[in-house]
């Protein structure tokens, strides 16, 4: 609690939550057949579902806001998964050590280690992407690891889209109707 008695949470802002609750929600939402959906993509035999889900949501949000078009809304899950777990090797760089895992991760394991909304949010908020799929295409884990291991170091900080605002919702409150309705906004 803060000094005025308000309960603070890393998951929601009370002011933002109050504003969202005052908005009317439609009875249902289905983006199929609109310009707000992107195609389903194949994550193959990797554990990169978290990267696919995060970027699919970001693509849809960018379409709704007019930031991307149907032709440009294809962001790289490879880039997100790789840089979440690979630190910069240059010890003189101000970005040295910026990555999500302190554990050693083999090259191919970047695509199988898994992740979640918190990992995606941390990487994207650090301005490490998202980049277009054409910059770091998704392929087999071994092919992607080989390409990314030899990619120019500038690829790490390229970004077509930068995450500036996001909210995390407590997964333990998934049955809470207010939280579920806020997510739909």
Where are these regions (language model features)?
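Alpha-helical support elements that line or immediately flank enzyme active sites
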Residues: 43-68
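A short glycine/serine-rich beta->alpha loop
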Residues: 35-46, 107-110
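Short, solvent-exposed loop/turn elements at domain surfaces
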Residues: 21, 38-40, 58
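Residue-level detector of alpha-helical recognition elements and their boundaries
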Residues: 64, 69-70, 95, 139
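Predominantly the structural core of cysteine protease catalytic domains
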Residues: 24-25, 30, 50-59, 79-185
């Amino acid at each position: 609690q803060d000094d005025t008695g308000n309960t603070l949470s890393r998951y929601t802002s009370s002011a933002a939550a109050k504003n969202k609750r005052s908005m009317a929600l439609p009875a249902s939402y289905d983006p199929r057949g609109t310009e707000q959906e992107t195609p389903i993509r194949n994550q193959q035999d990797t554990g990169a579902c978290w990267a696919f889900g995060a970027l699919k949501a970001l693509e849809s949000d960018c379409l709704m806001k007019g930031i991307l078009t149907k032709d440009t809304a294809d962001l790289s899950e490879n880039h997100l998964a790789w840089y979440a777990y690979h630190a910069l090797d240059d010890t003189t760089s101000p970005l040295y050590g910026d990555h999500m895992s302190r554990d050693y991760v083999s090259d191919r394991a970047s695509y199988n280690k898994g992740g979640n909304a918190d990992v995606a949010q941390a990487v994207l908020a650090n301005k490490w992407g998202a980049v277009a799929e054409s910059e770091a295409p998704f392929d087999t884990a071994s092919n992607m690891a080989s390409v990314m291991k030899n990619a120019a170091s500038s690829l790490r900080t390229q970004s077509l889209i930068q995450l500036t605002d996001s909210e995390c919702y407590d997964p333990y409150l998934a049955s809470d109707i207010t939280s579920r309705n806020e997510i739909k906004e």
